[in-house]
From Swiss-Prot:
Binding partners and assembly: NDH-1 is composed of 14 different subunits. Subunits NuoA, H, J, K, L, M, N constitute the membrane sector of the complex.
Species lineage: Bacteria, Pseudomonadati, Pseudomonadota, Gammaproteobacteria, Lysobacterales
Keywords: Cell inner membrane, Cell membrane, Membrane, NAD, Quinone, Translocase, Transmembrane, Transmembrane helix, Transport, Ubiquinone
Catalyzed reaction equations: a quinone + NADH + 5 H(+)(in) = a quinol + NAD(+) + 4 H(+)(out)
PANTHER family per the UniProt record, alphabetical: NADH DEHYDROGENASE
Protein name per the record: NADH-quinone oxidoreductase subunit N
Subcellular location(s) of the protein: Cell inner membrane
TM stretches of this protein: 18-38, 44-64, 84-104, 116-136, 169-189, 211-231, 242-262, 277-297, 305-325, 333-353, 377-397, 410-430, 457-477
GO biological process assignments: ATP synthesis coupled electron transport
Entries under Pfam families matching the protein: Proton_antipo_M (PF00361)
Function: NDH-1 shuttles electrons from NADH, via FMN and iron-sulfur (Fe-S) centers, to quinones in the respiratory chain. The immediate electron acceptor for the enzyme in this species is believed to be ubiquinone. Couples the redox reaction to proton translocation (for every two electrons transferred, four hydrogen ions are translocated across the cytoplasmic membrane), and thus conserves the redox energy in a proton gradient.
E.C. designation(s): 7.1.1.-
A GO molecular function held by the record: quinone binding
Keyword Nucleotidyltransferase appears in the UniProt entry: no
The encoding gene: nuoN
Amino acid sequence: MMTTPTLAPLTTADLAPLVPELVLIGGAFALLMLDLFVSQRNKVWTHLFSVAVLAVVLVLLATGTGGQGDIFNGMFVRDTAADVMKTVIVLVSGLSLVYGWTYLRERNLYQGEIPVLVLFATAGMMLLASAGSLLMVYLGLELLALCSYALVASNRDNGLATEAAMKYFVLGSLASGLLLYGMSLVYGATGTLSLAGIHDAIEGSNERTLLLTGTIFMIAGVAFKLGAAPFHMWLPDVYQGAPAPIALFISSAPKLAAFGMAYRLLEVGMGPLSPQWHLLIGGLSAVSLVVGNLMAIAQSNLKRMLAYSTVSHIGFLLMGVAGGGEEGYAAAMFYAVSYTIMSTASFGAIIALSRNGFEAENIDDFKGLNARNPWMAGLVLCIMASLAGIPPFLGFWTKLAVLGAAVKGDMLWLALVGVICAVIGAYYYLRVIKVMYFDEPVGEPLPANNDRVLGTVLGVNALALLALGLAWSPIMVWCQRAFAGLA
């Protein structure tokens, strides 16, 4: 006689690890309802509510509310690595809203759906960081991607923004298809969606051709989301076409979430195949370093320069992944966390120097900035020096960490490529510093920015790159704790 299987009842305690995500998604739905009753004149309340929701989620993560564990049969995993990534993701998402408020309001671009989309995109990134199955990876990825497409297209009257959103959507859909196809091959070969189950199935199997093919397709999808060459075609157009606050958001937190996706898929799921995919990741790293730096040199538009420099930074991040092991992943996370802070500050400077009717997005717009605004020039100097990897700024220690991980992972050739490209990359960052301090101003001096909140946030953000560079060890220890015991 057949018996019907029964499922254990799901209790409130079982959902405890999911508390930050539940609060965030609940806040997003509440904001969606609130926006219906708030006039355009009073949109500041939707802005403040969205920032408050992210602040509450940040506190929940920082205090460890809900505890660690896995739920839904391992589909959702909350561990130290997930908490580190989520904390930074939520912090940077909140900063993007703070940076963007005045900019979007002055240009009549601020609509209630923008903070709603940011909250849902943040929820998608948090799901990626905690994914324990292929299904959760795809759910988090699509939630992030669909919100990102809409955010890029938020300036409907701008042809560049519309074109960028269309390219982003088409190429993003293609990348999602590649990723999904790779997942289907892996599922067909292992018979499970669980990443831990896939790991065990691979260890007990001698037939790996189908698994390697699936891994290649998944790596292509991950590379697109990261912006690694040669899957970076969407980056320059999106960074240039999107409003600066949207470009800030897309350039920062999603990179950390994509790193989390790479870790879950490749190390947790496809770990037994690491000797094969480490070489592929190393190749992507080298190509990204070379292409990103060479293309960035030729740019006169600062947003496009930052887009190509992102490609090179992703190359350094992948260097840590290619190194593998506890040290490699800790170095890669250290780089990802630090880069999100640096990228936020770089686009924050563009926002702070822009005015309604004028976008400070060309390098020539920074000419003579020291003569007009020495404080702002000093902040931009800190940002560019950190991105270039000049000591004692934070960017120097991040590059040193991933280079060390590559050497320890027997990838000396990749470390040498990284050193050469780091020297090349310093050129275009130093060019921005040069025009600020040694070139004559172009045009009339810009009016002073009276937004004290924006100025304060940018000041703290930029000076943090110096402060954290002088005291980088706690961040590195934080990242090492996330991967303690990883072989």
